[in-house]
């Protein structure tokens, strides 16, 4: 069985979700730590770019045997279900399948609001999250080198709080 290529970040809830699913289903994969701020860290130039740069990006071979990026975890799960029958995560019962989809959609859309809010709304949390996220690929960087990376990540995430529905209330 060919290994599935997963590009993501360790702290991304969706990346964690997909890695957990792949491990549960015992599907072999290669995990590439990547994202918006990985210039010069890991060469992913051979991989096609997704239309929307989200994490994780999973690469599937298409009918022409070319890699094709996919970013929505719900649709990735469905595609994996079609490709691999062992250790399915989608119930066979139509009622349970509907409830499974409903719960997954709820978690995808609503739990991320809390994740974003508590990572990026309060000063101490912003510093902690920015420092942690910026060091995944730069463990040996000193403060002078890490600060612009941390600031860039923090500014981007804070600017997106409204997208996930987080606000001061």
Describe each PLM feature range.
Residues 1-144:
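GST-like domain detector, emphasizing the conserved glutathione-binding G-site
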Residues 144-169:
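A conserved mid-domain beta-alpha-beta active-site/ligand-binding segment of alpha/beta enzyme cores
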């Amino acid at each position: 069985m060919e290994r599935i290529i997963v590009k993501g970040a360790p702290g991304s809830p969706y990346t964690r979700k997909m890695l957990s699913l792949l491990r549960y289903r015992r599907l072999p994969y290669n995990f590439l730590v990547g994202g918006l701020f990985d210039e010069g860290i890991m060469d992913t130039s051979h991989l096609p770019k997704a239309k929307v740069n989200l994490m994780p990006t999973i690469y599937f071979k298409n009918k022409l045997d070319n890699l094709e990026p996919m970013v929505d975890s719900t649709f990735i799960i469905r595609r994996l279900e079609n490709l691999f029958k062992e250790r399915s995560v989608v119930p066979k019962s139509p009622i349970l399948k509907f409830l499974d989809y409903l719960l997954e959609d709820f978690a995808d859309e609503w739990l991320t609001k809390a994740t974003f809010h508590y990572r990026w709304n309060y000063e101490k949390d912003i510093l902690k999250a920015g420092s942690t996220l910026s060091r995944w690929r730069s463990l040996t960087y000193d403060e002078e080198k890490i600060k612009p990376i941390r600031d860039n990540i923090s500014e981007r995430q804070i600017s997106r709080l409204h997208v996930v529905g987080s606000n001061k209330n």
